[in-house]
């Protein structure tokens, strides 16, 4: 196992990798939104590649969030297990946490973790064990924070003046 050191340059490299992953992540975001919309009987707006890339910029603009997102991304990009052993769940744990970190605070973090599992069953990325969990986590986290869900648009019915 190689050592991993997160430096500002390493975080920037992960930012670029995540940003350029839009051809894979954006269709998965939209497939996930379609599936969730069907389950809940609601229309959910689709996400464009430009909106995704802009939001990646917002996530990585927060240094505290950026260093943690970069660490999860780097770990999942290299994480593998011999024979893709069924009892190996570390990739699932890291994927859920990445989705939550991208999404932000509660309730979005928990919603992103739940959405991770929906996206994960629809994702089959070639490569190491963590590859599909990485794509699913990015899709779940960004779909949660991006506009398109009616309940997140406008004032909450539970706001107190």
What role is predicted for each listed range?
Residues 1-161:
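Acidic, polar-rich N-terminal leader regions of halophilic archaeal proteins
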């Amino acid at each position: 196992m190689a050592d991993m050191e997160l430096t500002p340059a390493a975080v920037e490299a992960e930012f670029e990798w995540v940003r350029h992953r839009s051809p894979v992540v954006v269709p998965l975001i939209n497939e996930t939104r379609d599936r969730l919309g069907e389950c809940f009987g609601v229309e959910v707006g689709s996400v464009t590649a430009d909106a995704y890339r802009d939001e990646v910029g917002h996530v990585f603009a927060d240094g505290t969030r950026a260093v943690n997102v970069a660490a999860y991304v780097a770990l999942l990009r290299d994480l593998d297990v011999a024979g893709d052993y069924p009892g190996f769940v570390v990739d699932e744990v890291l994927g859920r946490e990445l989705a939550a970190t991208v999404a932000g605070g509660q309730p979005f973090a928990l919603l992103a973790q739940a959405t991770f599992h929906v996206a994960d069953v629809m994702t089959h990325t070639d490569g190491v064990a963590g590859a599909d969990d990485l794509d699913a986590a990015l899709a779940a986290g960004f779909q949660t924070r991006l506009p398109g869900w009616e309940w997140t648009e406008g004032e909450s019915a539970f706001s107190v003046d």
